[in-house]
Amino acid sequence: MTKKYLSLLLFTVLCLTINAQTYQKSTAAAASFTINSDSTATVLEWFNFIEGKGLVLSYTSTHVNLQEKVKVKQDTYSIQNLLSSVLAGYDFETSFLQNKILLQIKGLKRFHVSGCVYDQKTKEPLEGCIVVFMNKNQRQYAAVTDYKGVFHKELPSEPSYLNASYIGYEPSIRVFMTGKYQNIGIGMMQTAIPLNEVKVMNSPMSDVVNYRGASSMLSVNSNDPFAQINTLPGIYGSSVGGGMHVNGGQDDENLILLDGISIYHSHHNNTLLSQFNGETVEKVSFFDSFIPAQYEGRLSSVTDVRIKMGDFTDHHQSIGLDLPSASLTLDGPIIKNKLTYMISGRHSWIDFMKDLFSDNASASRAFNDLTGKLHYRINPKLAVEGLIYHSKDEYKDSINQIHNHKILGWENSLYSVSSHADLPRGISNISSVSLSKYSNSIYGPAINIPSDIFINEGMTKISVKSNFSKEVDKYMNLSWGLSMGHEKYNLLASQDAVKNNNQKITQVSSYINSRIKITDKLSGSVALNLVSYLPKNSKSYFSMQPRFTLKYAADEKNIISLDFSRMEQFYHNVCVGEIPIPTDLRMPSINGFKPSSSIHGELGWKRMDDNWRFSLSTYYKRRYNILGIRYDISNTGYEGWDRFIMKGNAESYGVKVHSMNQWNKWRLNCSYTFSKSVEWFEDYKNNKKNPTLHDVPHLFHCATSYMVGKDSFLSLGGYIKSGSLYNVYNEEGNISGQFISHRERRKINYRLDANFSDSITPQKQHLKFSYKVGLYNIIGNPKEDEIIDLYSIDTKKHCLPYFSLNIKF
């Protein structure tokens, strides 16, 4: 009986204890708060408000911003609901004990948002689309889609909506549904009037131009994909037939790719002519600081031009008439939603009318090119493409009493087949097989060779590439690949000789590149490129080229970056004159001509606002084993390149500033570069450092456009730059053949251009007119080659009026 009473007593005590604990818990948990009107206060002030009701909050402030202002709407709240409103962006847990609240704040909530952006009509992914996320407090975060149109972003707060923007497409705004943040599909519609502009992506800070730049408006061509690149800081354009000097480098140190396939000499015989037909270009990626590991073979920059495919559902035609050339472009489906075509051709036309414009009726420059692409979508995970490109440049003049005789010419050809596949385990692959050719010829008598023959030189390359990529997780993305190429050089045996010398070279390379998200604010890429260079009859070389970049996002608008790249170049091209000819030095790394190499470091800061982008960077570049022409000796009677070419080193450094603004109806694009470029050679002036011929200490570009109407713009812009250097030398005597030489700087170069552009859409929506009328060199003192190469047009004060027209139907 005693045991029975004891058991009953223990049960009663236990029930009372549980009831007391429940009462203690419910004392705090049952508290309610009435907010009479919408109120905004800091987190700390809201905590004080809760404690003012007789409750005790116990928390640590390590993972919460007590000064953040939070708005709470008018209502009656339980303690749990009020804390959920005040700490809406945080992960936290609560427990209650009498009038005490134990608050465990774990940190900010993380929302992983992902999706794909594509063309609503063709279903093609849109690479480089900017996706901006905004939360309820109007804070913005941005992401950029990859080549598959996919984006990923970790957000510190719940997004309310996103805004996707892409060149030539209407902006797409998407409101988020609560909890649905993954695998978002965003279809975008093209604008009624195409913007006629490609996207330019510029390393080191992924500068994606998402509106029509003022500098692009000033191009003489109706659609010039390189107009904006030529005005970027650190870039100094060279003369006709040449390329550009990037960060103090030579013009043979820039790699030009067409759909990932190298082009030996993509430039044409006129500075006003775009390298490629803008109607065929989808996008241009330009790298001059951190160069991704899949690119190799040049020291200073890489320009990767991607050719667009045809429309999957409708046929389109485009006719263009510019000052340099006329063009025709056709594209559309062969099998709807399966097989498309795109074909485009350009041809110079002023050479047909040269008699009306030139004092010398027999001198002319002719040009034509052809670009074509087939795209076959086998299934959603596999597609095959075929690309063809051919260009031809000629210069004709009177010689040996023969009028309109071909003097000089060069040709480029490229053929490739590629596949794009999504493999198992999230791996993507792009593989290609390609054939590229370059040939150059000059009429013998034009260079004092009496034989009535053409001197020819050229190169042929067959290559196989396979690139892979995989998103390992939200913190790492890996890419790797392997390529093999076989080159055949048809070289002149010597600078004066007509005989050719064939050289065969095999090159094998591999790379790995990892993009890593270290923290929410710190990310980077580490890459390595390995090359085996295997000439048939000369010394072999093995190259290791490490590269890395580090980016720190101080906040949503400011990015600090640090880049390093080591590059190696196995191809040398030294031009004796302004225009490339077969007797120039074109030499692979054989017969004692070692590879050139470079190291490049750059520290940059970039600020991105809604309508303003600003970047500032400083760089240092060191180049080893570069080649130069000796101007202090005569080449009379010379039978080889050895005494005519110098080998040495060079360095360059500078500061680059770039600003792009857009407000109301105005657009402004400005860039400034301060730089120094020097070189030194063992066989020249006792190895003393001397400014390079392309040393331009100050270079300023500026262009502005005013939106007169919906698609009408009035643009004004130009440049001011230090004059470049040139060699001055006089022969001392005929016996020694020695020269006394020094370098002098030309006068300051400047130029001012203006134009008006407009687009008109008649009632028939399938017909669109775009035109441009302007003045080239209204006032100025440009380099002489910018004037004499205007298709031999001679105008007073060299002010050239121009007109371009583009019709789409």
Predicted regions located by residue number:
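C-terminal beta-signal and adjacent terminal beta-strands/loops
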Residues: 720-732, 751, 758-809
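Surface-exposed extracellular loop regions of Gram-negative outer-membrane beta-barrel proteins
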Residues: 439, 534, 538, 552-601, ...
